[in-house]
């Protein structure tokens, strides 16, 4: 069973989660405007998981699946930095001991630095707290 087939099987237990799929990818659609998309791709060197503009590559299928599930949980938040209306940086934060802690970030090299920055926080609450996987 491929990782995509595994995800589809696990997501089927959550009919409220909407997603689109391709042969080597799956993308969960945010539940509303306060959420963010979560994607999973099989690539030649392993797997890529993305939360909107943020992304990370994995060689371990289990780690990639865990990261994907984390993006659907209330323990994950995405801080999106905008300059004007342009999204320029995405910071993945995790909830630890009641505090949001930055884990990883992805940003654009070229951005409209002359525009003032603001932060939008986006969060999915599609899985219960502490669920390690989309089971």
Label each residue range with its predicted role.
Residues 33, 41-48, 72-76, 97:
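Short, solvent-exposed coil/turn segments at beta-strand boundaries
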Residues 60-72:
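A short, charged, amphipathic alpha-helix used as a generic interaction element across diverse proteins
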